Amino acid sequence: MNEAGTPINPIAFQLGPLSVHWYGIIIGAGALLGLWMAMRESEKRGLKKDIFIDLVLFAIPIAIICARAYYVLFEWSYYSEHPGEIIKIWKGGIAIHGGLIGAIATGIVFSKVRGISFWKLADIAAPSILLGQAIGRWGNFINQEAHGEAVSRSFLESLHLPDFIINQMYIDGQYYHPTFLYESLWSFAGVVILLLLRRVNLRRGNLFLTYVIWYSIGRYFIEGMRTDSLMLTSQLRIAQVISIVLIVLAIILMIFRRMKGYADKRYADTD
């Protein structure tokens, strides 16, 4: 058993001088599982399954760059003094909202170039994106980041958590709220909901917008528990502001697209 105070080594293994970090392995695993899910669904919706391979070849590196840039921007007071740390993403410090912005922008351009509906691609990808986020939070677990306020061990035990989670939440002599776990479970629940909503045959675009709303609601409340949030002011957490904006924007888009006739097609339509 991993003893309290002895965290899991963030380095999974060495390849000569190269250190392979669990963080990268977990993020990569989430991306691959999400890609597999999207490829399976794309064939059912009249698209070639390799369309998502082409998309992720652009979307993943751009999303990672945007996620890191977003984080660095709001922590510039530190990175301006330590510029060599900017590229060290294996230590953590990538923001999901930044990655989402990069992925959406890439998807819009990609869909225009390929002559495919962006909303069709986004609907198919929505459960995959959320699955990747759910898995990716375990990279934060290994790095002992994205945690909440200090708590007692007895509190963590009252949640019936396995010992390996409780022990990994022991950081510098104190136990912490496993907020990474709360967000991961919220995201896994969202994947199930989105997969069920596929059967309802929603209007095109609404599945993706439902993902945005679901994720943002969970992120808003869980972010309030974290101690390492990016801050806009001393009292205002950036992720909470962005979450509110995304919820409002998604609802407006649902209504606007319906009123203007832009959402007449359904999820299951193959054209």
Curated annotation (Swiss-Prot):
Main location: membrane
E.C. no: 2.5.1.145
Domain of life per record: Bacteria
Location(s), subcellular: Cell membrane
Coiled coil start-end: none
Gene Ontology annotations of biological process type: lipoprotein biosynthetic process
Topological category with respect to the lipid bilayer: Multi-pass membrane protein
Regions that span the bilayer: 18-38, 51-71, 89-109, 115-135, 177-197, 205-225, 236-256
Short name of any one Pfam family annotated for the protein: LGT
Protein name per the record: Phosphatidylglycerol--prolipoprotein diacylglyceryl transferase
